[in-house]
Amino acid sequence: NDLFGNVAPAIPTSGVDVVTGVGAGKGYLMKQGMTVVFSGWQGDRPSSLSGPTAAITSAKKWYAPGMTLPVAKENGARITGASQDEFIADNASSNLLGTYYPRAANTAASLTIRKTPTDAPITVDASMWTYTAGTGVAEGGNTGATGFGFVTIDRAKVRASSAYAAALDAGSDNGSIYHFNYTASDPKPMGLGFLAVRDLISFLKYEKVDLQGNANPVAGNITTTLATGISQSGRYLRDFLWLGFNTDKQLRTVFDGMLPLVGGSRKTYTNYRWSKPGDYSRQQETHYTPGDQFPFAFSTITDPLTGKTDGLMKK
């Protein structure tokens, strides 16, 4: 009922090593002549298999590796731009909102609150929140000192003030939407995550050596390539297909088949400036996040609302 059987894989000491020893578990898929490749694509996730990010255990025999991306520059200069991060509490005490990107120094910022996504936001007085910069070692959205930064909200003062009554539910801000609006800096070209998977699979499928002369470990042995992803990675595969990345630079087919699971009708918030690949639109949370727009189906159809004609397999 899993990829490896009932034996826990052994974790290498370095993220660049091969999972060895009992890493293949009982090797069921390999005994059927298959090669299993886990490919990182999310540029805001750790790419190391070691330390606290290691996720291969007896109970969880897979690992979703990230990828290391450069910080984008414009003619060598730092890029800044408007960004927004969200906080919704389900209890009375949580009060930390982690920013997904570093806040540019000496720039204005504001915090707003609203009851539902379609309500007009109410600006929270600056005396009711503080921003603390982080070291940027951890992932975006982290609310600790090693994140990019975080906002501490004095929710008790917000609840006590009549100025925000319209954004509350009978005096409670549980479920209310806080937005931190700020000037972000140092975006990463997250869309390269599509190229990374495309080029990796194309290399394994077609090439003998890479541009540095490194040998393809499975050269000549790959006849059919299949991709599968669950939930977020399922949405990624739908986006990958729609954006046209299933054809490599030589116009060769990358994946012969795909099995995106639990992705629903969605794509991802990846190939955008100030993107957040792990985020997605929900009824209340991050409601306006890109990735839940037409097209939804694999076949090419016309959307009656926008008049657009498109499909995930059109390209």
What do the PLM-derived regions correspond to, one by one?
Residues N1-K315:
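C-terminal His-loop and adjacent cap/lid subdomain of alpha/beta-hydrolase
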